């Protein structure tokens, strides 16, 4: 497994631009409705240029596995889960970004910008940076349902 860290805001801006161009094309062509029927709630934001994919995060880390790895999907998620916990402990905000994985799948430009070695595929994406908002307390969790 390898990690690709996007730490420069200029590079994140490149990812955003390519992704927004792709999203705009999909919105105009109505293809987005086929891939993601519940997209209606994001359409206005996409049309207004709001960053619905990367959430204005300044940084991103992509975990990639060799295409022939035995646990190619699970291992990256486990690794980034540890990083997620560590970053949260340092008061750095995180956001899992499954939409970016789809964007990488559909866009050769994004894959080229990602610059993964041949034979590797992005399997998990974690956005991170200092949070734009602060909460006085955590949200109350729902009761856990236990089945006997």
Name every feature range the model reports, one short phrase each:
Residues 1-148:
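Acidic, surface-exposed loops and disordered segments
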């Amino acid at each position: 497994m390898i990690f690709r860290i996007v730490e420069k805001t200029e590079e994140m801006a490149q990812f955003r631009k390519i992704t927004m161009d792709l999203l705009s094309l999909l919105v105009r062509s109505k293809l987005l409705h086929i891939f993601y029927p519940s997209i209606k709630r994001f359409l206005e934001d996409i049309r207004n240029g709001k960053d619905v994919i990367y959430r204005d995060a300044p940084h991103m880390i992509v975990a990639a596995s060799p295409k022939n790895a035995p646990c190619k999907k699970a291992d990256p998620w486990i690794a980034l889960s540890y990083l997620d916990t560590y970053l949260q402990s340092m008061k750095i905000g995180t956001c899992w970004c499954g939409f970016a994985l789809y964007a990488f799948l559909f866009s050769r430009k994004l894959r080229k910008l990602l610059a993964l070695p041949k034979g590797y595929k992005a399997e998990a994406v974690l956005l991170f940076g200092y949070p734009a908002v602060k909460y006085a307390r955590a949200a109350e969790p729902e009761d856990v349902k236990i089945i006997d």
